[in-house]
Design a protein with these regions (language model features):
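A composition-driven surface/loop motif
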Residues: 1-247
């Protein structure tokens, strides 16, 4: 993406600084960096104990991780609490690491190292290593979409990737090691949701429970899939067909 007009957030140990066009939307309080407005934010450096919080209702927020290492001791590394459209971009040739705490401070909705209350898209061509020490690795309370040509590795105490409404892995390389389910979509009140769709990606799943756990359908199309699961390969029928809307 064009980041020439982006706001730069530089992480440095237990603090951070922001510069650029929308830096007024960035508040730094110790190790907590809160983004309150739309725009593109390029994040680099290392945060030894802190998190990125997005609270920008109805705004389009793009977080470009460009060599970012974020470790939180008592919550998520990235917590997208409210946004109209949330995208995490893994910059070309970058290596990024997100690690959450094994226990969270009380009153938090988040359950994952990379958490979003709204639909979340993860894209780009860089590398992302996620350790979900508390529960999940990457989780969205709505939909979760993995696209681009990124290399993503997730280790999670519970579920690896969880999109409550749906989980779509369109492309890229994904490796998941999960104490619960590797890939999960759990919405059960709407029959058009709760599905998992896997496209032209290379996916390796190791899980103590199900590798692929969907409430409704699992579709697999041109996917290179390697599974080692304790609870079985999937709890839904796996069909070789195009995902919804892509026939």
């Amino acid at each position: 993406p064009d980041t020439s007009s982006a706001t730069t957030i530089t992480l440095s140990g237990s603090s951070a600084s922001a510069s650029g066009s929308a830096s007024s939307n960035v508040k730094v309080d110790g190790g907590t960096v809160t983004i309150s407005g739309g725009g593109t934010y390029v994040i680099s450096g290392e945060l030894s104990n802190g998190r990125i919080v997005v609270n920008a209702p109805k705004a389009d927020v793009r977080l470009v991780l460009k060599g970012a290492t974020i470790t939180s001791s008592d919550g998520p590394a990235i917590d997208i609490q409210d946004a109209g459209n949330a995208i995490v971009v893994l910059a070309k040739d970058s290596k990024n690491t997100l690690t959450d705490g094994a226990s969270y401070a009380s009153g938090q909705e988040a359950t994952a190292a990379l958490f979003s209350s709204d639909t979340l898209t993860v894209t780009g061509t860089g590398q992302l290593d996620v350790t979900g020490s508390y529960k999940d690795g990457i989780s969205s309370k709505n939909g979760l979409i993995i696209t681009g040509n990124a290399t993503i590795t997730v280790k999670a105490a519970d579920d690896g990737l969880r999109g409550k409404d749906y989980l779509v892995v369109e492309s890229g390389t994904l490796t998941v090691e999960a104490g619960g389910d590797a890939l999960k979509s759990s919405e059960g009140d709407d029959e058009t949701k709760g599905f998992i769709s896997l496209g032209k990606a290379s996916i390796t799943l190791t899980s103590s429970d199900d590798a692929i756990a969907a409430t409704t359908d699992v579709t697999v199309k041109d996917t290179t899939l390697t599974i080692t699961a304790g609870g079985g390969q999937a709890n839904a029928t796996v069909e070789e067909q195009a995902p919804p809307g892509q026939e």
